[in-house]
């Protein structure tokens, strides 16, 4: 009896740290001071502290976070399997892909993971075991993980082999592959969850925009992992700012200043392609630089509040500290000034340097007040119009899976996030173009650039688009010299 009662608890404790990172909780920033929600005139969040996750999903599905469509029924049947079970395929078995798969299984719907793909078999096997452990922790039926050996695919073409075995596909491979994977999923008629960013260059952005239009035509739900659009404290905050709570927005300040991310050293026997694929964060054809891969979250919030995209950008950046042989070609800091059509500005900072001040947030200044942090709105006199306590809010990483799978299970077409995600990706890429070149970069020029970062051929023996010199160093962008358009 003792073992039956306490073994599940011990398992949970043993996996607590791993699970927090896997499911995205470790990425949710903490407020430095306790805040209380005191905005009484908008009912959607008046009782937020009393809501559980399922109740929140019901309410937030009517809010303006992701691109929510008027509900319409899907043509024919809701999903291709012709049963009550929603089959899910996972493409990209890293930490975020694994976390998304677990959250899909926890969505409250009859979801079964039926196929997996990754460039590397060890990543796939590790992901499979982590998902299995999470199912045990949450006491879910073991048959939710139904991936036979013949449905475990590796290599560059694994994504194509996953698609016949699923109704919904989770796309979480490195961002450089996202346009190709998304276009194939839409062509195959699959509902999609895909991680941000959705491209690393302008041709990729255009491919995603075209696939987004096709997904709309086919009534395929698409949710993108810009999870702030599914986060309680952001939903009401942005709604009030859009309604003019601080007047006209004059400036936005958005930040992702942190110590950086993982790095994988070159191993004996690796081809150059395998090394770059393993260490993908540090190569633009795979990642797009951290202004794109990470800072897109904050840039997207700026666009969301403004309900617009910038028309031009200029800035500066460089590679001052993080400049080892395994740090590829990306910068360690960027500062960009974006301008919108109405003349307002968004000032953007992102930095990956250990030992520096940590700041990951967004703030806005208006003609009659300010929004100094997510969930807080002040009048010019200092009166707090909004002060939201986020401690009991649902995990937005879970919410985005809940709403997607609820729509699919109910046969509804409700979510079309891809177009906005492509345009916020282009916002980030404009910033990179500006810092790499030292030039003013305009939206139309960036969108129509023909400069592709992707390799001509994807194979383990093929050369990647950027190669090291004899000393093992990669070419680094030089402002005033580097061409970006």
Model-identified regions with their sequence ranges:
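N-terminal secretory signal peptides
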Residues: 5-7, 14-18, 28-51
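N-terminal secretory signal peptides and thylakoid transit peptides that target proteins
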Residues: 48-64
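C-terminal helical cap and adjacent loop that interface with cofactors, partners, or active-site loops
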Residues: 59-63, 67-68, 99, 293, ...
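N-terminal Rossmann-like dinucleotide-binding module
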Residues: 63-142, 231, 302, 483-485
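Predominantly a Rossmann-like dinucleotide-binding segment in NAD(P)-dependent oxidoreductases
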Residues: 92-97, 217-224, 228-328, 338, ...
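A structured beta-alpha segment of the ubiquitous adenosine-cofactor-binding alpha/beta core
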Residues: 135-171
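Beta-strand-loop-alpha-helix segment that lines the small-molecule cofactor/substrate pocket
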Residues: 179-230, 244
